[in-house]
């Protein structure tokens, strides 16, 4: 178990904080601790609910990239719940737009982009636009 914990701490880049109390860490580091708690169990899938919402832009971008990389390296599938269309495009291989109560799938969109994604890339912007339009349409129907 100790070996697995040490490996996971290294994986989430918290080696220098391994003896720290969680409450003494920054928000981004606390998110890394939460990720490590899940990863140490060696899951096949992680479900993350708004995992980056409380982070500043720089920390969010770094953690998004790290989470994608870790998931790919370990062969873990991610299900990420987000209200951020930009985050969906940058993180997802598929984006699902849900609406209604109880939630129903309105549209599923394949996000066929390379691993390294740049928000300014025209293909990223095209998929973002499609998601925005779908979201507007669904929101209009609900109201």
What are these regions (language model features)?
Residues 2-17, 69:
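Conserved ABC ATPase "signature" region
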Residues 20-23, 41:
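Conserved signature/switch motifs of ABC ATPase nucleotide-binding domains
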Residues 26:
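ABC transporter NBD signature
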Residues 35:
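Hydrophobic anchor residue at the start of the ABC signature
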Residues 46-49:
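Catalytic Walker B motif of ABC-type/P-loop ATPase nucleotide-binding domains
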Residues 60-74:
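Helical segment within the ABC ATPase nucleotide-binding domain
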Residues 75-81:
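Conserved H-loop
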Residues 100-130:
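Conserved beta-strand-loop-alpha-helix hinge in the C-terminal portion
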């Amino acid at each position: 178990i100790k070996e697995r914990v040490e490996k996971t701490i290294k994986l989430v880049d918290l080696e220098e904080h391994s003896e720290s109390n969680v409450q003494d860490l920054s928000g981004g580091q606390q998110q890394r601790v939460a990720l490590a708690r899940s990863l140490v169990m060696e899951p096949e899938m992680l479900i993350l609910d708004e995992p980056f919402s409380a982070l500043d832009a720089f920390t969010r971008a770094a953690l998004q990239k790290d989470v994608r990389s870790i998931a790919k390296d370990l062969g873990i599938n991610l299900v990420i719940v987000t209200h951020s269309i930009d985050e969906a495009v940058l993180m997802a291989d598929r984006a699902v737009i849900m609406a209604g109560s109880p939630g129903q799938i309105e549209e599923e969109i394949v996000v066929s982009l390379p691993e390294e994604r740049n928000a300014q890339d025209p293909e990223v912007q095209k998929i973002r636009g499609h998601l925005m339009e779908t979201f507007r349409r669904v929101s209009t129907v609900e109201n």
